[in-house]
């Protein structure tokens, strides 16, 4: 599936710009790494499970470093420094800032490897995307829009169209706002307009944005901050260890899966965007002013879901129940 996504993305880039596709494909193929272990399942299920966990821990700390198949005397990716850039150096000398962004989705000071290029251009299908960080950051302003502002929105977006904004810069979010439509909140940031315009057209676009902000928000500008929420279950290892049969372990897994299915509706109710939810592990983007309330709701939901799996603690008279710890970075 990953190769299907990368093939589609790389083919689109290849139509408008040169890049080292061979190296990019090798880098994407090398991205994912899977470990698995197995051991005989005998009558003592807890012992077999502990043996499997021990083998997995040993495999994870066994480091092997095969030589890369794409190494060359080129710049490293500026995103993580792990892989070589696949964008030719000539492109930065020959193209304008606007052209670099339009063709590669790259700023002049950036270098992208195949994985970075895939992240900028990859499409996973309708309904399977999440909001951009700029859209999340703009959400406090977007929530203030109402039907009275529809005319102002149409006028602003219409001006951007008249100025020649690329078609793929509009109607890009997976879920429409009641007034702002499918347009990304990054259009509310003056500095982001430099990705689409330059010179006199940039000045006109920024003036149109300023007029829009004045009319709809009394001149208030969006703050460039958003929240990253990461949640992880507490006492889960000990809880698993207390499941003495396959049936009990499966029941615990089903309950954790049930919680994961409840996460996306919760995150969306707080105007956030879920990146990942699996068992007791959650990663999401949220507007800053909604993050704490979302964290409390997730923790309460997890506690209710896991209430049947409390166990006696070390003292013997104290019940320990799985809970959810939530961290928020802004």
Protein language model annotation of sequence segments:
Residues 1-278, 282-330:
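Regulatory/sensor and coupling segments of signal-transduction and defense proteins
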């Amino acid at each position: 599936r990953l190769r299907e996504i990368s093939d589609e993305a790389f083919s689109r880039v290849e139509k408008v710009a040169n890049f080292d596709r061979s190296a990019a494909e090798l880098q994407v193929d090398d991205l994912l790494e899977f470990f698995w272990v197995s051991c005989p399942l005998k009558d003592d299920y807890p012992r077999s499970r502990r043996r499997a966990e021990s083998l997995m821990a040993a495999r994870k700390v066994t480091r092997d470093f095969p030589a890369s198949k794409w190494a060359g005397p080129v710049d490293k990716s500026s995103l993580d420094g792990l892989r070589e850039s696949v964008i030719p150096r000539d492109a930065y000398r020959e193209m304008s800032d606007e052209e670099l962004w339009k063709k590669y989705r790259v700023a002049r000071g950036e270098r992208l490897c195949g994985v970075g290029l895939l992240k900028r251009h990859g499409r996973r299908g309708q309904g399977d995307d999440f909001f951009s960080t700029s859209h999340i950051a703009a959400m406090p302003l977007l929530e203030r829009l109402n039907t009275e502002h529809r005319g102002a929105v149409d006028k602003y977006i219409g001006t951007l169209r008249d100025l020649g904004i690329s078609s793929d810069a509009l109607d890009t979010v997976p879920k429409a706002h009641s007034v702002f439509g499918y347009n990304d909140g990054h259009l509310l940031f003056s500095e982001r307009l430099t990705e689409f315009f330059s010179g006199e057209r940039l000045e006109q676009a920024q003036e149109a944005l300023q007029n829009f902000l004045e009319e709809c928000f009394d001149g208030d500008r969006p703050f460039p901050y958003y929240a990253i929420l990461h949640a992880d279950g507490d006492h889960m290892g000990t809880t698993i260890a207390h499941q003495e049969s396959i049936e009990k372990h499966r029941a615990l897994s089903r309950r954790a899966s049930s919680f994961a299915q409840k996460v996306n509706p919760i995150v969306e109710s707080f105007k956030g965007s879920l990146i990942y939810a699996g068992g007791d592990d959650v990663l999401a983007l949220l507007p800053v002013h909604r993050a704490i309330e979302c964290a409390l709701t997730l923790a309460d939901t997890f506690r209710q879901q896991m209430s049947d799996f409390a166990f006696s603690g070390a003292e013997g008279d104290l019940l320990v129940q799985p809970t959810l710890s939530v961290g928020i970075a802004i």
